[in-house]
Amino acid sequence: MIKRTSLSFACLSFFYLSTISILQANETDTLQFRRFTFSDREIQFVLDPASLITAQNIVLSNLQSNGTGACTISGNTQTQIFSNSVNTTADSGGAFDMVTTSFTASDNANLLFCNNYCTHNKGGGAIRSGGPIRFLNNQDVLFYNNISAGAKYVGTGDHNEKNRGGALYATTITLTGNRTLAFINNMSGDCGGAISADTQISITDTVKGILFENNHTLNHIPYTQAENMARGGAICSRRDLCSISNNSGPIVFNYNQGGKGGAISATRCVIDNNKERIIFSNNSSLGWSQSSSASNGGAIQTTQGFTLRNNKGSIYFDSNTATHAGGAINCGYIDIRDNGPVYFLNNSAAWGAAFNLSKPRSATNYIHTGTGDIVFNNNVVFTLDGNLLGKRKLFHINNNEITPYTLSLGAKKDTRIYFYDLFQWERVKENTSNNPPSPTSRNTITVNPETEFSGAVVFSYNQMSSDIRTLMGKEHNYIKEAPTTLKFGTLAIEDDAELEIFNIPFTQNPTSLLALGSGATLTVGKHGKLNITNLGVILPIILKEGKSPPCIRVNPQDMTQNTGTGQTPSSTSSISTPMIIFNGRLSIVDENYESVYDSMDLSRGKAEQLILSIETTNDGQLDSNWQSSLNTSLLSPPHYGYQGLWTPNWITTTYTITLNNNSSAPTSATSIAEQKKTSETFTPSNTTTASIPNIKASAGSGSGSASNSGEVTITKHTLVVNWAPVGYIVDPIRRGDLIANSLVHSGRNMTMGLRSLLPDNSWFALQGAATTLFTKQQKRLSYHGYSSASKGYTVSSQASGAHGHKFLLSFSQSSDKMKEKETNNRLSSRYYLSALCFEHPMFDRIALIGAAACNYGTHNMRSFYGTKKSSKGKFHSTTLGASLRCELRDSMPLRSIMLTPFAQALFSRTEPASIRESGDLARLFTLEQAHTAVVSPIGIKGAYSSDTWPTLSWEMELAYQPTLYWKRPLLNTLLIQNNGSWVTTNTPLAKHSFYGRGSHSLKFSHLKLFANYQAEVATSTVSHYINAGGALVF
């Protein structure tokens, strides 16, 4: 017997109300929920009086003498509800008054476990098993408001307390193939607010969605590490793996709370191969103890590794909190690779706002992009020091000795890793006695380790307000003790960000780019060394008003000694060995780290532009031939875009700064950042020592104590350039050949249509036909080729006069798709053609056939640049056409075949409206010259008709078609983002071609069926035109 009560139901749609609402979780107070949708019903929790209801399809097996056994629920086609049970029996869960050695629920309809309560210390608010728990291939599975808590506590050291698993507790738990899983408002007194297992937990192959919301652990044993007992606000795998894999719907962990791991606690956690979005939001680790806090991992806590791989949807770690370390994740090492976009936003902790790395063993940490960016933004640390409150630091790394312990940062093509918060990598010495650390340390950092990583790793303060930047003071990005190598792709420092290399070498491969943007600073400290082989300056941002050039500098203060408040700072002026080594060229790049010549407006000259500065405290810190080693000629290889000449010039000045060891409090005005902003007034013509105000140390924070200080002289080398433009060469992928080719193609449509307007011998006819046109244009010279396919219909009416005059009125409509061969550029069109044809007989042997037509086209164009950039535009065109054909009839019979010579002139003229694109690299096209063509096929026509009924007729034409007059379409084109301009025209065509037409008809009394085929062949172009249909003839 199972104690159950009913729930009140009202029809609505699925439980996605909860899962989708999580996208705005911070606006939703789930504690206020009294109803939600589940399995196409809206559920409101109203408890009926307790009643005993016989459970359906429950099988007990392998029963033992002590009453234990295996429990299976399977094959139910109606919703099964297990609710309002209170169980105090040892070893059994809240919903079942029995001890199970295993529990399996498979192939059921909906299963609801609600308001069950387990008070004994063995755990399992709804279900407990001494072996495995398995939920397999069920429909919607819901655990709501189940509780495992309330056992009698026997003392301060009772480590055997087992109020585990607010909903489920077993040795292993497997949830596979279910349609949906929802665990809401469950609570345990020990680990696993919703689910707890002694070993592995596996959640796989869920069809629609997974939701863990508002689950809690609470532990009131007065034990010095109580948070260890209450870990895993939603899920706890006590000694093994938690795996969430191969699920098809969204996965949401929202508002869960635990002592460690606000959502998940495990030895290892793997989330991989899921297809939809994954969200960890508003989870919190709020453990407590009698001594120091160890509440780590606001969302996830593992003692070993955390793996996030091959997930297709967007992934969010948003607004998670830990009272100690790891606002989002606490783990031994991280493995983030090959996912969709990943966002770490608004997480907070006392140490490591995003990550706390405990380093239990040697490991490689991976932060690699997949198909989207990885973004770290507004992750904040909080401390008892109000001056430090609100600082944005991503990492906290435990200070234990592990080797090798490495980090790999990799951004794949067209993706980026954005560090908008401080990246501070430290405490990774091989041996703490090594001071300075060994430059050959195995605890390395590698940026873009393989050729597939051609994207960018970006350090930027773009998302930091001025108040936050002031609060940061001397704090900045740095790498300590880990030799760093940039192998491929780009490492960028932008938007006033600073990256300092402490104590170790930074090495760059020539296959990579080190890009510096506005206000960026690359600093090398004592015992450090910069080996730069390919330096780029992000020019468009530097040229904006109020922006300053980047700087590469030696830290004037020796940060290895005398850094405490009250100590006299030491400088690096005594170091005379090279610390900044150049061995390559200087490039000018844009915001995408590509050639600047085709992305910014360089149509006007620029004079005395500061683009880079290099600062040292001793002349020996640069190679003696550093100016020649850093190739500043700025002579780029042949390139598209603006052409011109750079004239570089180095200007050397000196200035003095005051060192100090003040705190980085907001009240301190002597931070490095402030010194850089206020210490010098510079003009390009000034080559003498600048007049520098002597900056005194501030007491800072109102403490009333002054800091000792010292002065150091800085030598500053500033690169000033002049630019003289001489022209613009367009990149063929941006040239717009397809636009001009579409105008020629419209003329070809007109020509094909006019050639088909040939009246027959009927007195009156109504005709309809389906049409297709295929065209293949070869690439010629540097112009792109294309292929096109169109389909449509045509209707016409013909009438004949008393003297052999014939009139034909035709209308056709077609849709056309064009695609360039070398690019993915496409154009789709609709054409509407109206034509009037007139046949006039002369001298009984000559027939003149004239026609006039108008073809109106609407076009949608899409251009692609790489994998992520594209532009689109709409325009229309008008084509006017005319033809005149002369046939010499009744003159050349060959048995029963009539051969008729003919000559024809075909005229077309196409004009487009102006075209303005939107999107990336948008262009503006305006007409300079319309496309005009006159061709004249000269050939012979053969006709044959049978004397039988129905009448069979064949007709064939062969002709040589020279081009008598040709004007290429010319479009003045402007690349809007940089004012680069050029003339767009079509792919060159052969001036001579051959034309053939064949037709076949079958005529009954008043019904005619026909099929026509035309082909035009030239060395540049091949076209095929087919129309087939029927006519009523009289």
From Swiss-Prot:
- Pinpoint the Autotransporter domain residues: 755-1034
- Where is this gene product found? Secreted, Cell wall; Cell outer membrane
Q: What keywords were assigned to this record?
A: Cell outer membrane, Cell wall, Membrane, Secreted, Signal, Transmembrane, Transmembrane beta strand
Q: Which domain of life is it from?
A: Bacteria
| Listed Low complexity bias regions | 664-673, 680-709
UniProt signal peptide:
1-25
- Where is the major localization of this protein? secreted
Provide the topology term for how it sits in the membrane: Peripheral membrane protein
* Annotated region (Disordered), positions in chain: 664-709
Give the CC-aspect GO terms: cell outer membrane; extracellular region
- Similarity comment: Belongs to the PMP outer membrane protein family.
Q: What is this protein called?
A: Probable outer membrane protein PmpF
**UniProt organism field:** Chlamydia trachomatis serovar D (strain ATCC VR-885 / DSM 19411 / UW-3/Cx)
